[in-house]
Amino acid sequence: MLKNKRNKRTWLIILLAVYLLILLRITVFRSNSYPIEMSVNLSLFTDLAATYRENGIWMVLYLVVGNIAWFVPFGFLLPMIWQKLKSFYIIPLGFLLSLVIESGQLALNKGMFEIDDLVLNTAGCAVGYLIYKIYRDFRS
């Protein structure tokens, strides 16, 4: 039983590592086919409002759902791997990961630093943690 639990944990750690590598590849270490202006947007949801005016609701939904969805695995996998990790650390760790990604995009000229992304990514981590809690309670 202990070996099976350790084996499961090992696979979850590998899954988390692969997820993080993919996330960093598509956000920070992507190749740009066009020049990106280095900028910081600290006005909450102004870019989403502009996107709505220019491209409609479907593009806004794509951006919102995408930013949330990319962080759901993080919020789910962390407590699956480290069950003793206190719940109040999960969401701040998601925020910190998002902050690292946004800062990396800015520093490497791979995208803008956007407060919207920080909020939506952190929300995605919270959704992932909520899914974990439902899963854990269901299994009990």
Where are these regions (language model features)?
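Extended hydrophobic secondary-structure segments
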Residues: 113-123
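Bulky hydrophobic segments
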Residues: 1-110, 115, 129-140
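Specific aromatic-rich, kink-prone transmembrane helix
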Residues: 122, 126, 130
